[in-house]
Structure formats: C-alpha cells, structure tokens
Amino acid sequence: MVKLWRRYIPFINAGIQELISYRVNFILYRIGDVMGAFVAFYLWKAVFDSSQEPLIQGFSMADITLYIIMSFVTNLLTRSDSSFMIGDEVKDGSIIMRLLRPVHFAASYLFTELGSKWLIFISVALPFLSVIVLMKILSGQWIVEVLGLTTLYLFSLTLAYLINFFFNICFGFSAFVFKNLWGSNLLKNSLIAFMSGSLIPLAFFPKIVSDILSFLPFSSLIYTPVMIIVGKYDASQILQALLLQFFWLIVMVGLSQLIWKRVQSFITIQGG
C-alpha cells in the first residue's frame, strides 16, 4: 500500500498544482455555474408562483432551492475531465509519456483528478455542506438523521464520481480512433447534464421517461446523491439507489478494461 501511494502521490500533487495554477480559470467557471444556479432558482420560483399548489411532484420551493444548491455542489465533485485530458494528449502526442510510465493508465488520470477534487471539496463543498447540515439541525430535524443522510450522501457522491470517471475514460479511449474529441465531449456533457437530473429533477419527467432515465448510469451522477441529501428517498429507496450505483460502477470499470484492450492497436502518436 505504501509503495502504491508513493507511486501515485506525484499525480495527486500534479492535480492540486494544476488547480492552483489555473485558479482564475476555475473561479470564472464557478461564477458561470453560480449564475446558472440563480437562473434555475428564479425559473423555478416563477413556476411555483404561478402554481396554486405548494407542492409540485412532491417538491416544495424550499426543496427545489436545496436541490439546486446541492446539484451545483455535486456537479463540481462528480465532474470528470479525463476524456478531455486523453483527447488533448492524443492530439498533441504527449500521451506517449503517460504510456511509458510504470503506472496503470486509467489510475494515473484518477489520482490526478483526486488531487483537484480534494481541494474543491475543502474549499467549496465542505462550507456549503456544513451550512446545510447546520440549517437542517436548527430547523428541528433529528441530528442523527441529518448526519446519517449526510454520510450516505458522501458515500453516494464517491460512487457517482467513480462512475463518471470510468465512463469518461471509456469515452476518452475513442480518441485513439477518432483523434479529436473536442466537439463530441461538449455534446456528451450537455446530454449528461440533462439525463443526470442536473437541470431538472427526474421526478418532473413523464413516468416512463423518468423510469428509463433513473435506470441509466447518468441518474447516479447527480440525481441520486442530491435526492439523498434533500431527504426525498426513504431507506429502501436509498438502498436500491446505492445498489444501482454499485452495479453501474462495476459495469463501467469492466467496460473500461475491455475497451482499453481493444483500442491499444489504434494508438498512433500525433504532434512533434
């Protein structure tokens, strides 16, 4: 374990340093995310103001507000840029340096992202989560229940990130065949934002659409962890959701290994 840690700690440090080096870029993107969250809030406020009912699909305005906030936080922590990194490295030829290192190909990207995710969690997610937990407790909710849901949220969040990471690894492997993934990456991210419940909770879709989207792996990325922390899932629903996340994680890991074996024959180096 110590040997493994020493092998991958440079990648963790690289992820931290990259985030620090491009902090202005990171801040500007987050400002854009916050503006998007405000737009979503006022759109939902208009919907509830025009409705005669205090609840829509079981959500109050307070629930939707919490959903929007936690969707923003969850998206920060589950987002993976591994497909972009693979695409860029294949395009400029630097992928050969990663392939020559005595480390697992996918694990090198994983530990690089974990470095930046840890910094994001400490600086952004933890303050948000602490305030929400405190507000829930002050509102009269049982402390044990709040802490339990928070723990389950963090566990589900970890599974969500790993699912998204290995999905992006699978997608990134197509760069060995198509060489340029920039446009397809943008399309992929837009579709995932829709299907993950990041923009609209899946409960608001027609039942058959909601059932299909809820089974797909993308609902595990945002919708599942957010519904847990918002308190919209009971114990049996939480168990089913976590088991589904485990299922998709196993599928994505297995699929990444299978695709990696197939695409190695397509490796050609571009660049200088």
Pin down the residues of each PLM region.
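Hydrophobic transmembrane alpha-helices and immediately adjacent juxtamembrane helices
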Residues: M1-G272
